[in-house]
C-alpha cells in the first residue's frame, strides 16, 4: 500500500493491499477500495462506496458523492463498482437515492473518459466506453459492450441494450435495443453495430440474423406487435435474437423509432 502523506484517508476507510493514493486525494470513512486500485492526486472517493480491484481513478474525479436530486435527504445510499475500470479526469459517479434501490452500480472493465457522468441509481454493465462528456441522467440502465460517443446525453429512466453504439452529440430520450447504432437529436435507429459485433466474435451468420431483426423492427412498416411476433419466431432458432426480444419486453420509455 502506498499513501501519499498529503492525502486525507479518513479513519474507518478500508484499503486493500496494493492500493495507491495520490497527493491531496480524499478517501471517506465508509469507503472500501480493492487490491491494486490507484486513486490519483486530488481525486475524491466518498460516501458509502465500494471499489473492486485494479481500478484507476484519475485526478479530480469524484466517486460516491451525494446524488444531484432535490429529494435526497442524506440517506446512506451507495455506489458499487467492480474491477478494472478507468475513471479519467473530472468523471463523476453519484450514489443512489432512497426513492429507487439506493445504489448506483458499475460493472467491470469500463472506460469513463474525461468529464463523463454517471448519475444516481444508474446501472452500467461491463466493457463499456463513455467518451468525453457522455452523460447519464438518473435511473439509466446500460448493458455490456456499449459505446457512448462524446457529448452523448441519456434521459432519465432510459435503457440502452448491450452492444449498442450511440453516436456523438446524440440525445437519447427513448430506449435503444441491443446491437443498434443510434444517432441524432433525438436519437433515431441508424443501423446495426456490425463492426462492433464482428470485433466481439459474432459470426457472419449471427450478424446477418441481427440485421434481419433490425429490418423487421425498423424497416418493414409492420405494426410493433406484429414485428415483435416475428422476432419471437426468429428467436426460437436464432439465440442472438433473444436479447433483442427480451429488451423490447422490458422497455418502459418506448423504443427509439
Q: Which residues fall in each region the model found?
A:
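Terminal amphipathic alpha-helical/low-complexity segments used for targeting or macromolecular assembly
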Residues: 1-6, 11-12, 17-18, 54, ...
Amino acid at each position: 500500500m502506498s499513501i501519499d502523506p498529503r492525502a486525507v484517508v479518513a479513519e474507518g476507510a478500508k484499503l486493500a493491499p496494493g492500493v495507491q493514493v495520490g497527493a491531496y486525494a480524499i478517501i471517506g470513512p465508509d469507503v472500501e477500495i480493492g487490491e491494486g486500485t490507484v486513486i490519483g492526486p486530488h481525486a475524491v472517493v466518498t460516501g458509502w462506496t465500494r471499489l473492486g480491484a485494479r481500478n484507476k481513478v484519475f485526478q479530480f474525479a469524484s466517486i460516491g458523492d451525494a446524488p444531484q436530486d432535490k429529494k435526497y435527504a442524506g440517506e446512506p445510499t451507495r455506489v458499487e463498482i467492480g474491477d478494472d475500470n478507468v475513471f479519467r479526469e473530472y468523471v463523476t459517479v453519484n450514489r443512489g437515492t432512497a426513492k429507487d434501490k439506493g445504489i448506483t452500480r458499475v460493472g467491470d472493465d469500463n472506460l469513463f473518459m474525461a468529464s463523463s457522468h454517471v448519475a444516481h441509481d444508474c446501472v452500467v454493465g461491463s466493457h463499456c466506453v463513455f467518451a468525453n462528456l457522455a452523460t447519464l441522467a438518473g435511473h439509466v440502465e446500460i448493458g455490456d459492450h456499449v459505446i457512448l460517443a462524446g457529448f452523448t446525453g441519456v434521459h432519465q429512466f432510459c435503457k440502452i441494450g448491450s452492444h449498442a453504439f450511440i453516436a456523438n452529440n446524440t440525445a437519447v430520450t427513448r430506449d435503444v435495443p441491443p446491437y443498434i447504432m443510434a444517432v441524432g437529436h433525438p436519437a433515431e435507429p441508424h443501423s446495426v453495430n456490425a463492426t462492433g459485433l464482428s470485433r466481439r466474435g459474432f459470426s457472419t451468420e449471427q450478424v446477418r440474423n441481427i440485421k434481419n431483426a433490425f429490418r423487421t423492427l425498423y424497416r418493414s412498416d409492420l405494426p410493433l406487435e406484429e414485428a415483435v411476433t416475428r422476432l419471437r419466431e426468429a428467436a426460437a432458432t436464432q439465440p442472438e435474437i433473444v436479447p433483442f426480444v427480451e429488451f423490447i419486453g422490458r422497455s418502459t420509455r418506448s423504443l427509439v423509432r
